[in-house]
């Protein structure tokens, strides 16, 4: 379900409690969450999509949150399917939008979504580049090998919020972690297990962030 994170920022991701193994390797008895956000300003930026398994829920969350407005940007932090699964749908649904990704991420769009036409629709960003949405300004920081080579994170300088891709993730769905009811529940165990299995061997790169 959508949830307000900050004055102009809404969470529009989805929990997936039907999945038993993350990346077909790691048991996730509490499932996982696919995290996606919308920043509302003079221009609207959608931060990542979700896995196709949750397409219907994400589309509903997105369009309910937009209230008839059209997004200007889709910021793609990471090209794994749990972040990028609905890029092609988004590009077709919002033909005037621009897809923002790292220099290494842009070529992967056509590799992952060969039937989609991204020509004239992309913006490649590099370390320290910024994107103004109006009041909000995003700064992009490259995070290669956290844990794929094209990964980047973005920092909303106005809100003081970091959109961190996989760098600081955790296993488990958000409902069971108290995200929707503001309860403080244990994040540490599943956060540590996620870091050890997914990002641990790239610890130096994570710490550089």
List PLM regions with ranges.
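Conserved phosphate-coordination/catalytic loops
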Residues: 30, 52-56, 81, 200-207
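Conserved beta-strand hairpin/beta-sheet module of binuclear metal-dependent hydrolase folds
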Residues: 2-64, 153-156, 160-164
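Short, flexible loop segments at the rims of nucleotide/cofactor-binding pockets, characterized by
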Residues: 22-27, 50-52, 76-78, 138-144, ...
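Metallo-beta-lactamase
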Residues: 4-7, 101-209
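Active-site environment of divalent metal-dependent phosphoester hydrolases
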Residues: 19, 79-84, 107-109, 147-148, ...
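Glycine-rich, histidine-containing beta strand-loop boundary motifs that form or position
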Residues: 78, 101-105, 165-166
